[in-house]
């Protein structure tokens, strides 16, 4: 929520440049943490990582989830799904789809990823892509067209700490800060979407041997996605 690109897009929406907000599309697929590396204590990937995108979709919609349908895959025959896509509606009629998985070319010679936010209105669009170093925001409104390129900014923990400190000093919570309720709802709905996926066909594709190869490769990688650093 503290990212410059999300706030730029939200401001553009507030200006009426895309008309009425209609569709929110969020995707985050990387060859990141593999099963067994460090997710289990927080659940499958869609909860540990995907809950952030559940939150950002709800933040854009400014409404609560109403309906949903989820499809997942048990990649490499692992016990839990490591890729999930959910689509549905919010109470205000806005439609969403969220795609998340750390299954994106784990054994590719040169790894890559696919991450974006795509906001579609009745008149225009706003979208963002990034490569974890640089973020590109493209705004196509009824009176404005912009292409903004700035440093990605990571998780912006420094901004979060700054807002929190200012809230303590002033005795008033910054409206830019999420509430505990927001975190609880993001977690709750990530679990709900996972449970919904388990009620549908949940195919297992691939073999555990491939997962073993992935873990071994990641264990020896010097530069990769979401590598766990071991300190002596």
What are these regions (language model features)?
Residues 4, 48, 155, 178-181:
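Residue-level signal for the nucleotide or nucleotide-sugar donor/cofactor binding architecture
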Residues 1-35:
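A contiguous active-site-proximal alpha/beta segment in oxidoreductase catalytic domains
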Residues 48, 52-136, 151, 158-173, ...:
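Contiguous beta-strand/loop segments that form the cofactor/metal-binding neighborhood of enzyme cores
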Residues 40-44:
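Short glycine-enriched, charge-decorated loop/helix-capping segments at active-site entrances
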Residues 145-149, 167-185:
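Glycine- and charged-residue-rich phosphate/anionic-cofactor binding loop of Rossmann-like
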Residues 189-200:
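Short arginine-rich
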């Amino acid at each position: 929520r503290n990212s410059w690109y999300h706030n730029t897009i939200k401001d553009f929406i507030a200006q009426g440049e895309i008309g009425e907000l209609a569709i929110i599309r969020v995707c985050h697929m990387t060859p990141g943490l593999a099963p067994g590396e460090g997710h289990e204590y927080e659940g499958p990937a869609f909860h540990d990582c995907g809950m952030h995108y559940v939150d950002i979709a709800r933040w854009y919609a400014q409404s609560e989830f109403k309906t949903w349908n989820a499809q997942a895959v048990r990649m490499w025959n692992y016990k839990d799904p490591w890729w999930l896509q959910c689509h549905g509606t919010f109470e205000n009629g806005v439609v969403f789809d969220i795609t998340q998985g750390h299954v994106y070319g784990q054994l590719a010679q040169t790894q890559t990823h696919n991450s974006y936010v795509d906001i579609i209105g009745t008149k225009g669009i706003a979208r963002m892509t990034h490569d974890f170093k640089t973020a590109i925001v493209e705004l196509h409104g009824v009176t404005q067209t912009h292409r903004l390129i700035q440093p990605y900014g990571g998780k912006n923990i420094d901004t979060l700490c700054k807002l929190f400190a200012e809230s303590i000093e002033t005795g008033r919570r910054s409206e830019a800060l999420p509430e505990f309720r927001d975190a609880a709802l993001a977690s709750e709905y990530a679990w709900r979407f996972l449970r919904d996926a388990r009620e549908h066909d949940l195919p297992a594709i691939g073999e555990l041997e491939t997962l073993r190869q992935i873990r071994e490769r990641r264990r020896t990688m010097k530069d990769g996605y979401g590598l766990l650093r071991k300190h002596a």
